[in-house]
Curated annotation (Swiss-Prot):
This is Acyclic carotenoid 1,2-hydratase. SUPFAM superfamilies: AttH-like. Belongs to the CrtC hydratase family. It comes from Cereibacter sphaeroides (strain ATCC 17023 / DSM 158 / JCM 6121 / CCUG 31486 / LMG 2827 / NBRC 12203 / NCIMB 8253 / ATH 2.4.1.). GO terms for molecular function: hydro-lyase activity.
Length: 279
C-alpha cells in the first residue's frame, strides 16, 4: 500500500508534464493470491487533503496516531477484476529510525526508511485478513525517476535481530549506489556492507533481478506479487550473513519505463478521476 502525491507511475501525471503533483494523487493497494486486487486511481487536486498527521485521498486516508499508522481503504480495483476494495490496515512500528538516505548527490531523490521493523494487521475485502511483518518507508523526489536512474533493486529481509535493507541503483550517468542498512527492532540503524549481488530468475516480463546473497548461495523467488513490463515485486528467499530469510524484493527497469509505448497500457490499470467532493 502506497500513498502518492505526484503519482510517479501514472501516465496521466507524465502526460501533464508533471507540473502539479497535487493534481495526481492516489492510494495504491495491491493484494496477492486468490482474490488479489490492484487499485491505483489517479485523483485530482480536489480529492487531496493534508495535515501534519493525515493524508486523505478521496474516500481513503492514512493517519499517524503517534504510535501507529492507520489506513482506511475505500477504493475500486483496476481491470480485469473491477470491484470495491475496502477495509482497514494498522501498522505498528517497533521502533522509528532517524535515517535519511540521499539516492542522488544533488538531493533530488531521498529515501526515508521510517520503520523497517513493524507489525501489521490487515482486514480487507476479498478475504484478505492477516497479521505479520510490516514495513514503513517513504521516498521523496523533485525529478522523475526515469530522468535520473536506469535501474534499481530494493530488498527488505527479516533477520534474527531486526531487518536488513538493501538498495542497489544505477544512475543514468553510470554511477552506482550500493547500500546496506541493518535496523534493530528498536529502530537503531547502522550501515552494513551488503553481501555480493547474486542474480536469480527474471520476472514473467523478463525484468532482470538480483539481490545480495552470501557466497555459495543462490536467491530464489518464493512468490510473485506484482509483474509489469518494467517492474517486479516478489517474495524472495536469500541467505545473508549466514541467515536464510524470506523478504520482499523489487526490481525497477527505468529504461523500459521511459518508453512512451507503455503509457496507454498503464492507463488501463491507472484510471483518471479528476473530480471529487468531500461534502
Amino acid at each position: 500500500m502506497i500513498g502518492f502525491i505526484g503519482s510517479v507511475f501514472s501516465p496521466w501525471y507524465r502526460w501533464s508534464g508533471r507540473k502539479e503533483p497535487q493534481n495526481h494523487c492516489c492510494l495504491n493497494v495491491a493484494t496477492y493470491g486468490p482474490g488479489g486486487r490492484f487499485t491505483m486511481t489517479d485523483r485530482g487536486r480536489a480529492a487531496l487533503r493534508q495535515s501534519p498527521d493525515t493524508l486523505t485521498v478521496g474516500p481513503s486516508r492514512m493517519h499517524w496516531t503517534g504510535t501507529q499508522l492507520i489506513v482506511e481503504v475505500n477504493e475500486i480495483s483496476s481491470p480485469p477484476l473491477v470491484s470495491p476494495v475496502k477495509g482497514r490496515i494498522v501498522l505498528t512500528p517497533t521502533g522509528i529510525t532517524d535515517v535519511e538516505v540521499t539516492l542522488k548527490d544533488d538531493g533530488s531523490h531521498i529515501w526515508r526508511p521510517f520503520a523497517p521493523t513493524a507489525r501489521i494487521e490487515v482486514d480487507l475485502t476479498q478475504g484478505h485478513r492477516w497479521h505479520g511483518h510490516g514495513y514503513f518507508d517513504a521516498n521523496f523526489g523533485t525529478a522523475a525517476l526515469e530522468a535520473d536512474f536506469r535501474f534499481w533493486t530494493w530488498g527488505r529481509y527479516p533477520v534474527a535481530d531486526g531487518a536488513a535493507c538493501f538498495y542497489d541503483a544505477t544512475r543514468r550517468d553510470g554511477s552506482r549506489l550500493e547500500l546496506g542498512l541493518h535496523v534493530a527492532a528498536d529502530g537503531r540503524a547502522r550501515l552494513i556492507q551488503p553481501p555480493p549481488e547474486a542474480r536469480f530468475a527474471r520476472s514473467r516480463w523478463l525484468v532482470e533481478r538480483h539481490t545480495p546473497a552470501d557466497p555459495g548461495t543462490r536467491p530464489r523467488q518464493v512468490m510473485s506479487m506484482l509483474d509489469a513490463p518494467f517492474y517486479s515485486r516478489a517474495m524472495v528467499e536469500t541467505t545473508v550473513f549466514g541467515q536464510k530469510t524470506v523478504g520482499v524484493h523489487e526490481a525497477l527497469d527505468l529504461r523500459r519505463f521511459r518508453s512512451p509505448l507503455l503509457m496507454p497500457m498503464l492507463a488501463v490499470r491507472v484510471p483518471r478521476r479528476p473530480g471529487w467532493s468531500f461534502s
